[in-house]
Swiss-Prot record:
Protein family: Belongs to the dicarboxylate/amino acid:cation symporter (DAACS) (TC 2.A.23) family.
UniProt entry keywords in alphabetical sequence: Amino-acid transport, Cell membrane, Membrane, Symport, Transmembrane, Transmembrane helix, Transport
Stretches the record annotates as Disordered: 413-434
Pfam families xref list: SDF (PF00375)
Organism whose genome encodes this protein: Lacticaseibacillus casei (strain BL23)
Protein name listed in UniProt: Serine/threonine transporter SstT
Broad class of where this protein is predominantly found: membrane
GO cellular component terms attached to this protein's record: plasma membrane
GO biological process: serine transport; threonine transport
Function: Involved in the import of serine and threonine into the cell, with the concomitant import of sodium (symport system).
Catalysed reaction, written as an equation: L-serine(in) + Na(+)(in) = L-serine(out) + Na(+)(out); L-threonine(in) + Na(+)(in) = L-threonine(out) + Na(+)(out)
Gene responsible for this protein: sstT
Residues that span the membrane, as ranges: 14-34, 41-61, 72-92, 135-155, 172-192, 210-230, 282-302, 316-336, 351-371
């Protein structure tokens, strides 16, 4: 029974949940028992999210390898830079187009925001070095991020078996989170019913503005910011490669909503481009963790929308801190449907916003997630391919071998590109030495 339920598209189930929740919220707003579904769903997310974030970040950091003879270093720089620039763009857009959400009962459980810079820094440092076990129990995401980075760095020195155990633990908790997310349609029924019964249709319409802002920012980043990065690295017209990656990788990712499912597609596309197999065989799978520009946009915009709703003044310092925090914390979630939403409580804690308020915003995220998460996954997955190719072309340019990107893309479309394998790379090096 459950297997048949899981086989049904999550998008379809969420759409049905939205329709049912909206109808019940308008027709029978007095049926408060329906709200329990939303409370159960949010409660389950609150329980699993801290452990999920901890293991994902720790696992991703532990896998980093240095000294390998490939374009890996350039790819990592591009991945991290793209995630940071995406977060900065999201913060800038949030300042230009501030949005307020309607959160039922928000003012009753809001915490006071920190006032001065000294208080903010002291609070951040104190929270970051809290006991890691207590942090997992209490949902202290700053401490979770701090300890996962440190432990992940330490794990780089351990054996492959140890790293495999950590990876399998992360995969196990991810599977649990995925099972929880499978019940999102029921949670959405409860959340939407509660929102409509307490705030009316006008309050829910504000979610449409939030969705438009999220999607517009992601489109801007992929079609303006990322191409500019490609041009800086290659000094070639970036748009043939940009649009090609959207077509071959972004469109499938939009419908599957899973970066992990899209990895084979990206590997084949890299082969079609004639990229170095030794490089893309590592960078494409890692991109699911290290390259999370779409997730950083979601976290930044939804966190600032929450701050605006609560009347929290966001200083330039806190905004910049949010950019870095969103970029770092987004590492590891782009392979999970709806994973970026689980990072909102951590980012919201910067502004003294309670976990209860943040989880209400997570609920809103699942309501708009049919479109938001699809676009986010498309941006993340397509940019894995975009930056893997860019890194190799940039390194070739530095070595005095500029690449005709348009010709490469055209050849890839026809399947006539020359594939660069590790063996061919070694042969080329031997020829140069002779």
């Amino acid at each position: 029974m459950y297997k048949r339920y899981k086989d049904v598209s999550l998008i379809l189930k969420i759409v049905i949940g939205i329709i049912v929740g909206a109808v019940l919220g308008v027709m029978v707003p007095s049926w408060s028992f329906i709200d329990v579904l939303g409370k159960l769903f949010v409660g389950a997310l609150k329980a699993i999210a801290p452990l999920l974030v901890f293991l994902l970040i720790m696992s991703a950091i532990s896998k980093y390898r240095s000294g390998a003879k490939n374009h890996f270093g350039t790819v990592i720089v591009l991945y991290l830079s793209a995630t940071l620039f995406s977060s900065i763009a999201a913060v800038a857009v949030s300042y230009l187009f501030p949005i307020k959400l309607v959160l039922p009962g928000a003012m009753k459980i809001a915490e006071s925001a920190p006032k001065d810079l000294g208080t903010v820094v002291t609070s951040l440092l104190t929270n970051a070095v809290a006991n890691p076990i207590s942090a997992l129990v209490e949902g202290n995401y700053l401490a979770i991020l701090f300890w996962s980075l440190l432990i992940g760095s330490g794990l780089r020195l351990t054996s492959a078996v140890t790293k495999k155990v950590v990876t399998e633990l992360a995969d196990t908790v991810s599977a649990v989170a995925q099972n929880v997310i499978q019940f999102a349609p029921f949670g959405i029924v409860g959340l939407l019913h509660e929102s409509l019964s307490k705030t009316g249709v006008k309050g829910v319409m504000a979610y449409g503005q939030l969705l438009m802002l999220l999607v517009a920012t992601m489109v801007f980043v992929y079609l303006v910011v990322y191409p500019f990065m490609v041009w800086l690295m290659t000094r070639k017209n970036p748009y043939p490669l940009t649009f090609w990656t959207l077509k071959v990788s972004g469109i499938p990712a939009f419908f599957t909503r899973s970066g992990a499912v899209n990895i084979p597609i990206n590997l084949k596309a890299s082969k079609d481009l004639g990229l170095n197999e030794e490089s893309y065989a590592i960078s494409i799978p890692l991109g699911g963790s290290a390259n999370s520009g779409g997730a950083a946009i979601t976290v930044s915009i939804m966190t600032l929308a929450t701050a605006n709703t609560m009347g929290v003044h966001v200083s330039i310092f806190l905004a910049l801190l949010l950019c870095f925090l969103s970029a770092i914390s987004a590492t590891g979630v782009s392979g999970i449907a709806g994973g970026s939403l689980l990072l909102i409580p951590m980012a919201a804690s910067l502004f003294g916003i309670s976990n209860d308020i943040a989880m209400q915003v997570v609920g809103i995220g699942f309501i708009i997630g049919v479109v938001q998460d699809s676009v986010e996954t498309a941006v993340n997955s397509a940019s894995d391919l975009l930056f893997t190719a860019t890194a190799e072309y940039a390194d070739d340019r530095r070595e005095g071998h500029p690449v005709d990107i348009r010709a490469k893309v055209k050849a890839a479309g026809k399947g006539t590109a020359e594939v660069v394998t590790p063996e061919k790379t070694n042969e080329a090096e031997e020829s140069e030495q002779v």
